[in-house]
From Swiss-Prot:
Its cofactor is [3Fe-4S] cluster; [4Fe-4S] cluster. The keyword Transcription regulation does not apply. GO terms for biological process: anaerobic respiration. It comes from Dechloromonas aromatica (strain RCB). [4Fe-4S] cluster 3 binds at C137, C140, C145, C180. This is Perchlorate reductase subunit beta. InterPro entries: 4Fe4S_Fe-S-bd (IPR017896), DMSO_Rdtase_II_Fe-S_su (IPR017839). [4Fe-4S] cluster 2 binds at C31, C197, C200, C212. GO terms for molecular function: 3 iron, 4 sulfur cluster binding; 4 iron, 4 sulfur cluster binding; electron transfer activity; metal ion binding. Residues 101-121 are annotated as: Disordered. [3Fe-4S] cluster binds at C149, C170, C176. Residues 12-40, 128-159, 161-190 form the 4Fe-4S ferredoxin-type domain. The gene is pcrB.
Length: 333
């Protein structure tokens, strides 16, 4: 029998403008320092920023399966530890304090790690391209992890829609790891329990923005309640309709959205003429965000041109985000 989920009264929602993410990993570090420094969590990055196109973290997560197909829950694959990157250490003490002459090398020898292919992208100069894709738990409206859990350990908080794993109820079945198509629940081998992003709900309860959002130096992130018509997330998703979920075909109805990137045209054709083709192939963006991305790119281009001509654009003002308080719940860190 499928687990019964009560619809939340409100839904906390995130938007990231991929045109402003600079790949600095400040959000990654903020999340890591706050939540995953315990035993068995070395390899976990509840929040990570990966280069797209690329293998991602864990490797090849986009092909692991899970989610829903025709409304039916799908079983995916549990990524092996090598796909996350086996944690490694450096023998600094031996070199600095014990007189060892060998070079300081990581042990064990790393074969994979988060951002293993950072900044590689695709294509050849001068038309090579990539962009940064920050990822976290999507706190889905239809979370596959919740339905898959055999111990009813996963629930969606009534007050904010954040999806949480009840640690006392979790028995380490890993059904959530297997069923999430975004590979965002992690199995803690020390605690024998699943861990995942908790949406910084202790901060939300105090009226403070999540750590990843508050620390974003590129001012790329927005967070708020989708029913708040004054919030930037409501405006970007519902009013201007320029923010889209990642892989909507997975069927979980994510509550993390993205403003797709605009990188401009390719540099030159072989005959020396300028190209009108976009540097990022449209098919690539459609593969990530669905067919609607074409309309969104057209809206962004129109509004950008208005702003360049000195005309007013409410949408661009929201995206620029001159005041942190307009982009999020209290930005206090």
């Amino acid at each position: 029998m499928a687990n019964v989920m009560k619809a939340p009264k409100r839904q906390l929602t995130y938007v990231t403008d991929l045109n402003k993410c600079i790949g600095c990993q400040t959000c990654t570090v903020a999340c890591k320092k706050l939540w995953t420094t315990g035993p068995g969590q070395d390899f976990m990055y509840w929040r990570n920023v990966e280069t797209t196109p690329g293998l991602g973290y864990p490797r090849n997560w986009q092909t692991k399966g899970g989610g829903y197909k025709n409304g039916e829950l799908q079983k995916g694959k549990i990524p092996p530890m090598i796909d996350y990157g086996i944690p490694f250490e450096f023998d600094y003490a031996g070199r600095l304090f014990e007189g060892k002459k060998e070079r300081v090398r990581p042990s064990p020898t790393p074969r994979s790690a988060p951002n293993w292919d950072e900044d590689q992208g695709a294509g050849e100069y001068p038309n090579n391209s990539f962009f940064y894709l920050p990822r976290m738990c999507n706190h889905c409206t239809k979370p596959a992890c919740l339905e898959a859990c055999p111990n009813e350990a996963i629930y969606k908080r009534e007050q904010d829609g954040i999806v949480v794993i009840h640690q006392d109820k979790c028995k380490g079945a890993q059904a959530c790891v297997q069923s999430c198509p975004y590979a965002k629940p992690y199995f803690n081998p020390v605690a024998n329990k699943a861990n995942k992003c908790i949406g910084c709900f202790p901060r939300i309860e105090q009226g403070v923005a999540p750590g990843c959002v508050a620390q974003c130096v590129g001012r790329a992130m927005h967070v708020g309640f989708i029913d708040d018509t004054n919030s930037s997330v409501h405006k970007l998703i519902r009013l201007y309709k320029v923010a889209l979920p990642l892989h909507p075909e997975f069927g979980t109805e994510p509550n993390v959205f993205y403003v797709p990137p605009v990188l401009g045209p390719r540099m030159e054709l072989p005959n020396g003429e300028l190209s009108t083709d976009p540097k990022i192939p449209l098919a690539q963006l459609e593969g990530l965000f669905g067919k609607q991305v074409r309309d969104v790119l057209a809206i962004l281009q129109t509004e950008r041109e208005k702003k360049m001509k000195g005309l007013a654009s409410d949408l661009m003002d929201v995206l620029i985000g001159r005041r942190s308080a307009d982009m999020m719940i209290s930005p206090l860190t």
